[in-house]
């Protein structure tokens, strides 16, 4: 956001409101100082005074109570890069991660409910609530305990250590392999919220223009499109997936992957009655009711018929069980053979490991909350009460190279990870590109699995698709231990700042990138571990740290 001079002296009430500006907003939108917060507060106060609602606005910001009064005002565009008034208010005092108007809704008690087509809005930041997306529901994994799954893997005490060590060793081996590159252009987080709004009839938030695309560039070897219009978005949303049940999935697959059926469940044939038996149009029902052959009392052998004389076959209720005692005995014996492994969610959903070239710097960091900021500043882990911030500038390395120091100085606002509807997205907040390697994203988009994607500034992309992962895990559980074990790679995402690697770069491996980190998704990785244990793999080897 642009700077503009702050007048002297400062109103004490403005200083009090500036203290309420969120720290993450000051970092990602401003210059990291309280002076920027004062500038934003003064700008918003001018808007409130212009519409004679400053007292109500001040009262709402200080008290932080939804019961405070409404602050009606025009949703005018502010000077500089502050955007619309309501977005600036919400970003400053309530939601530091808000990007679109479709991410919030007015509370029921607000007398000036927000509408993107209306000129007037309520500036009270506590008269809005965050739109909670429904979590992607996945079926449990069914494991047959009597199958031969081959030789089980050797698992160490920590599942993360297994793949962390293997990845670094294999990087040396596959350094000579070709790693494709692609440039990602588009906003998959916006597509996620636009799709949700379309499914729920919130068309006031929809943007009928182009949503963006994957654009081929001199450094990209693949070009993809995220969707060209709102019509194509709805078409993909309503398309049915004939291969498997249509469990709800938020987000939009690229054209290279199979589109899923949103918010619906396709029942199997055993649970349904044929349409011929179940449904009749109004005219047919009328013909039956007025037919002389229709009688509520079935005298003799007379049966109800249609008007043209065709007999009506009654639908008999199904018995609870149609199995013999022997069949029920087989079912009870099979209950001990098959076991379901449910997906479980833990608050600590993300683990970060920071590297400078091939050297791990610092310790692993666990992340809680629905989003995590990885920036280039110097805040320590103890400074973040919510454990949702990871500052690379805090870590020292006495053997740091000049190139690494230069890249660290360019990171700035960094990147942000989101956990939305059970799936993971990445947003680039830097002024420099970042390079992302995600097997899950590559599989979803139809890329080669080791493809490295260049994400330009302000870009977003989905790096973990829960529904796709569930399908792969369900298939692997019918094969071998190694097939299941290898899916841990889908739970790892690599992100490099400024310097990419692959066939279009001098660096053939991520180990030569100056500044990068690995993000491990704890919940899917734990699911893989639970399936392995259920399949009969030996328990993890305990060490002296146990």
From Swiss-Prot:
SUPFAM superfamilies: SMAD MH1 domain (SSF56366), SMAD/FHA domain (SSF49879)
Residues covered by region (Disordered): 234-268, 292-317
Domain MH1: 16-137
GO biological process, one term: cell differentiation
InterPro entries from the UniProt entry: Dwarfin (IPR013790), MAD_homology1_Dwarfin-type (IPR003619), MAD_homology_MH1 (IPR013019), SMAD-like_dom_sf (IPR017855), SMAD_dom_Dwarfin-type (IPR001132), SMAD_FHA_dom_sf (IPR008984), SMAD_MH1_sf (IPR036578)
Keyword DNA-binding belongs to the record: yes
Pfam families assigned to the protein according to its UniProt record, in alphabetical order: MH1, MH2
Ranges where the MH2 domain occurs: 349-546
Claim: DNA-binding is one of the keywords in the record: yes
Tissue-level expression: Expressed in the excretory cell and gonadal distal tip cells (DTCs).
Gene3D superfamilies, A to Z: 2.60.200.10, SMAD MH1 domain
Annotated signal sequence range: none
GO molecular function, one term: DNA-binding transcription factor activity, RNA polymerase II-specific
Subunit description: Homodimer. Interacts with R-SMAD daf-14 and co-SMAD daf-3. Interacts with orphan nuclear receptor nhr-69.
Family: Belongs to the dwarfin/SMAD family.
Functional description taken from the UniProt entry: Probably a receptor-regulated SMAD (R-SMAD) that is an intracellular signal transducer and transcriptional modulator activated by TGF-beta-like daf-7 signaling. Plays a role in TGF-beta-like daf-7 signaling in regulating entry into a developmentally arrested larval state known as dauer, in response to harsh environmental conditions; partially redundant with R-SMAD daf-14. Plays a role in inhibiting mitosis and promoting a switch to meiosis in the germ line, perhaps by down-regulating lag-2 transcription in the gonadal distal tip cells (DTCs).
Record protein name field: Smad protein daf-8
Gene name of the record: daf-8
């Amino acid at each position: 956001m642009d700077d503009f001079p702050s007048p002297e002296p400062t109103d004490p009430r403005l200083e009090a409101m500036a203290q309420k500006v969120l720290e993450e907003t000051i970092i990602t939108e401003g210059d990291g100082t309280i002076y920027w917060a004062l500038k934003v507060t003064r700008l918003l106060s001018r808007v409130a005074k212009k519409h004679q609602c400053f007292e109500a606005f001040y009262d709402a910001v200080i008290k932080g109570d939804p019961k405070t009064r409404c602050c009606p005002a025009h949703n005018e565009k502010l000077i500089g890069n502050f955007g619309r008034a309501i977005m600036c208010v919400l970003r400053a005092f309530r939601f530091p991660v808000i990007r679109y108007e479709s991410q919030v809704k007015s509370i029921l008690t607000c007398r000036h409910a927000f509408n993107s087509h209306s000129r007037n809005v309520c500036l009270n930041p506590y008269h809005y609530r965050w739109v909670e997306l429904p979590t992607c529901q996945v079926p449990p994994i069914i494991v047959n305990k009597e199958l031969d799954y081959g030789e089980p893997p050797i698992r160490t005490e920590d599942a993360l250590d297994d793949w962390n060590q293997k990845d670094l060793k294999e990087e040396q081996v596959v350094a000579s392999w070709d790693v494709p590159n692609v440039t990602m252009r588009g906003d998959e987080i916006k597509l996620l919220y636009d799709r949700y709004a379309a499914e729920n009839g919130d068309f006031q938030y929809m943007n009928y223009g182009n949503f963006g695309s994957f654009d081929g560039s001199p450094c990209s070897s693949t070009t993809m499109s995220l969707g060209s219009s709102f019509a194509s978005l709805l078409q993909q949303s309503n398309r049915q997936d004939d291969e498997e049940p249509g469990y709800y999935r938020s987000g939009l697959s690229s054209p290279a992957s199979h589109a899923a059926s949103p918010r619906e469940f396709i029942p199997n044939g055993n649970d349904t009655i044929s349409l011929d038996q179940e449904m009749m149009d109004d005219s047919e029902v009328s013909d039956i009711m007025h037919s002389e052959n229709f009688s509520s009392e079935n005298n003799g052998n007379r049966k109800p018929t249609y008007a043209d004389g065709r007999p009506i076959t009654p639908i008999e209720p199904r018995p609870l069980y149609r199995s013999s005692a022997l069949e029920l005995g087989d079912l009870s014996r099979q209950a001990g053979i098959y076991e379901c492994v449910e997906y479980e969610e833990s608050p600590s959903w993300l683990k970060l490991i920071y590297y400078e070239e091939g050297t791990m710097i610092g310790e692993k960091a666990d992340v809680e909350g629905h989003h995590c900021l990885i920036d280039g500043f110097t805040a320590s882990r103890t400074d973040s009460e919510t454990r949702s911030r990871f500052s690379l500038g805090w870590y020292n390395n006495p053997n740091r190279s000049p190139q690494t120091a230069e890249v660290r100085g360019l990171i700035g606002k960094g990147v942000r990870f989101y956990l939305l509807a059970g799936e993971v997205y990445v947003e680039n907040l830097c002024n420099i590109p970042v390079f992302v390697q995600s097997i899950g994203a590559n599989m979803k988009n139809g890329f080669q699995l080791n493809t490295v994607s260049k994400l330009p500034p302000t870009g977003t992309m989905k790096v973990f698709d829960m529904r796709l992962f569930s399908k792969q895990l369900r298939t692997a559980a019918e094969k071998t231990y190694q097939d299941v074990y290898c899916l841990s790679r889908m739970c790892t995402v690599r992100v490099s700042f400024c310097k990419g690697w692959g066939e279009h770069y001098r660096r053939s491996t991520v180990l030569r990138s100056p500044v990068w980190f690995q993000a491990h998704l704890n919940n899917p990785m734990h699911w893989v571990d639970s399936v392995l244990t259920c399949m009969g793999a030996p328990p993890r080897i305990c060490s002296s740290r146990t």
